[in-house]
Amino acid sequence: MTAKALEGIRVLDMTHVQSGPSATQLLAWLGADVVKLEAPHGDITRGQLRDLPDVDSLYFTMLNCNKRSITLNTKSERGKEILTELIRRSDVMVENFGPGAVDRMGFTWDRVKEINPRIVYASIKGFGEGPYTAFKAYEVVAQAMGGSMSTTGFEDGPPLATGAQIGDSGTGVHVVAGILAALYQREHTGRGQRVNVAMQHAVLNLCRVKLRDQQRLSHGPLAEYPNEDFGDEVPRSGNASGGGQPGWAVKCAPGGPNDYVYVIVQPVGWQPLSELIGRPELAEDPEWATPRARLPKLNKMFQLIEEWSSTLPKWEVLERLNAHNIPCGPILSTKEIIEDDSLVANEMVVTVPHPERGEFVTVGSPLKLSDSPVEVTSSPLLGEHNEEVYVGELGLGDEELRLLKSSGVI
């Protein structure tokens, strides 16, 4: 069997909820041995948003595949001793507790690197150093303070959260990049290092084009935005692409909530598009023929396209536009996505067996490595690997394991 990309890398996963588990799950998919350390009562998401009684929720199972689970009360003295040994044996340690929580356990960065000078210690917090450092953050808080919400929505409406989990899972991806870079640098230096990623910072990185436009505003209105008024900050612009090529979501038949196709109008696409919508004369009309001429009339342009698209189902609109190499995509509902044969074939929508809840559907790995294929396996039951890790790897005796359990240490 082919060795995995991160085979031999041991990850001590002290994360919970979403931002941290999304990162460590990616590491597990890449072949790392990820040991999820949970309090004896377990990660809170095991019981959150349950769809079935008395089993791990989808919230938990979909973020913790391919991991092992151990339980440990890190507030107890024996728990701290065991945690010390786990740190000593690990290549990577990841946590996303509230600010200062791990330090208060007695495991500051100075202490951690004293235990294991080669360890890469990654932390996720809401904010960087400064006035917000001690503040708690959740997904939408990070969106609010990272530039996403103020620029999402329509001009005359309130700021909106995006459905994409850019604050949590988006931060997780950034953490993985930092961990991999630190592991690579360790090959040259022989020592580990601290990796810190703030959720606000990760969201801002994903919103950088809006910071670009903030600076462009000083030179005049943003012509590619459909907005009528511009102040001194980047406005919400609905479904406008905000890029060099204008785009919009146009309605399709029969008019359901997701009967839309997003269309990008490139310069080369205007001539075939004008023919498709039954207005071939616009390809030569100087009022419409060039991107510069169309720019002040983007709303009218997409209105003309919608007059055509609204008479056809979105899949037919997709087919006709793609026949002319016009960039577009139908708005897919979550039901359509979970039933999409191509996503199943690409192992992006995968069915995973679970020992208690039966099969569940989850997202597969978007990272496709030719020499390190991913097989998504079930999330672990709470403490499922206690004996395997504590007895088989740390060398504790069976009797001590029983005492640890009866005394609430594990």
Curated annotation (Swiss-Prot):
Reactions performed catalytically: formyl-CoA + oxalate = oxalyl-CoA + formate
The keyword Nucleotide-binding appears for this protein: no
Keyword line: Transferase
Residues annotated as the enzyme's active site: D168 (nucleophile)
InterPro entries, sorted: CoA-transferase_III_domain (IPR050483), CoA-Trfase_fam_III (IPR003673), CoA-Trfase_III_dom3_sf (IPR044855), CoA-Trfase_III_dom_1_sf (IPR023606), Formyl_CoA_transfer (IPR017659)
Gene: frc
Pfam families the record matches: CoA_transf_3
Gene3D superfamilies, per the entry: Crotonobetainyl-coa:carnitine coa-transferase, domain 1, formyl-coa transferase, domain 3
Family: Belongs to the CoA-transferase III family. Frc subfamily.
Protein name: Formyl-CoA:oxalate CoA-transferase
EC annotation from Swiss-Prot or TrEMBL: 2.8.3.16
Binding-site list for substrate: G243, G244, Q245
Organism annotation: Streptomyces coelicolor (strain ATCC BAA-471 / A3(2) / M145)
Binding site for CoA: Q18, S19, L72, N73, T74, K75, N96, F97, G98, R104, K136, A137, Y138, E139
Keyword Nucleus among UniProt keywords: no
GO molecular function term, any single one: CoA-transferase activity
